[in-house]
Amino acid sequence: MIVGVMASGDESLAKKHEGLAKQVGSLIAQLRFDLLTGGGGGLMKVVGQAFLDAKREILDQNRPAGNLISILRAKELPQLKRDGKRTWEANADNGLGEIVIRTHLPYSGDEGRDTLSRNHINALTADLVVILPGGAGTLSKLQLAWEYGKDIMIFVGKGNVGGKTPEDLARQFGGIEIGRNEQDLRSWLKSHKKN
């Protein structure tokens, strides 16, 4: 099962919510789920590193473990060159992904719901979605996951998503769970675990 963690790439939010992101990454690894992120910096990198650190401990015990999947966006829309080849460059890659999917899709942030955003792939690929603190881009991922009918937990501690509190988001997007602590997140993830 793939757990998509949708979070900000903003480094200042990563410093502020580092502990929260580490809890999420570590717990997903301990439960032996696969983790999907946008493969960028900020909280995406923190959650990915925590996942890999916990995964190493699991593998040291000769137990099976999940994989870290990174869905990368393009820096800009690829262009066809005269020689028939296309230009392509990743916008950001935190270097942690074990399975890396490079898209041609450049949009993010306020444009995160556009058809040229990799956020559609993130939302559709994940079986479950955990939302960490973030701005407009994280909010667009939440909205897409909700539109695609994914099970979602907001886990933001004292943070918010796009300036909205968890309660605001739960009212706006019916059926979303709010995780208040690690036990809430653990119980929610375990309730979806298939043996």
Predicted regions and their residues:
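Generic N-terminal amphipathic, Lys/Arg-enriched alpha-helix
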Residues: 1-16, 24-31
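Residues at the starts of beta-strands that form the adenosine-phosphate
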Residues: 2, 34, 67-68, 151
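Acidic/glycine-enriched connector segments
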Residues: 20-31, 41-144, 148, 156, ...
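Short active-site oxyanion
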Residues: 32-35, 174-175
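Short acidic-hydrophobic, aromatic-tinged amphipathic segments that line or gate anion-handling sites
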Residues: 99-104, 172-188
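Nucleotide-sugar donor-binding patch of glycosyltransferase catalytic domains
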Residues: 152-178
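Short, hydrophobic alpha-helical segments
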Residues: 189-195
